[in-house]
Amino acid sequence: MQISIIVPTFNEARCLSETLTQIQQLSPHQLIVSDGGSNDNTIEIAKNFTEFVIKGPSGRAPQMNAGAQIATGNIFLFLHADSRIEPASYKKMLHSMKNPEKIGGAFSLCIDSEKWSLKLITRLANIRSKYLGMAYGDQAFF
């Protein structure tokens, strides 16, 4: 199984290095950063981690599509630049995708905050995802 991780970016210099460092620890087949017109150091930071840095139209969906067009893996994982995936969760995804009946999925949402409102949003998003099969765009999905 070859995983292409696609990270759409727009002015993500403040958090990108940490995210890409964590992604490298997962040892994906390919890491693609698809930028939507950043005017900070996002592109320079991304080039320190991968040769696959593309500049495309702004907007999350067009950036994700641009990344998917050059992806060579047989599974595409879309992850926001300010997000993380636990190695154990990544391994569960790999195991799950060995089942030929599985066509994709999403990770649970976890917002690192003590605010009750964000905890509520997290809980409701995960309930919606689990029971209705509808993930939010902020969840990593594959």
Give a label for each model feature.
Residues V7-P8, Q24, P28-G37, I54:
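Short beta-strand/loop segment that forms part of the nucleotide-sugar
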Residues N11-Q25:
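Short, well-formed alpha-helical segments that are part of the catalytic scaffolds
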Residues R14-E18, D40-F49:
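Acidic helix N-cap motif at the loop->helix transition within catalytic regions
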Residues H29, I43-I70:
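Conserved donor nucleotide-binding strand/loop of the catalytic core
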Residues D35-I43, S83:
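A conserved acidic beta->alpha catalytic loop
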Residues F76:
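Short aromatic/hydrophobic "clamp" motif used to bind/position activated sugar donors
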Residues A88-S117:
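Conserved donor NDP-sugar-binding/catalytic core segment of glycosyltransferases
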Residues M134-F142:
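Short glycine- and hydrophobic/aromatic-rich loop-to-beta-strand nucleating segment
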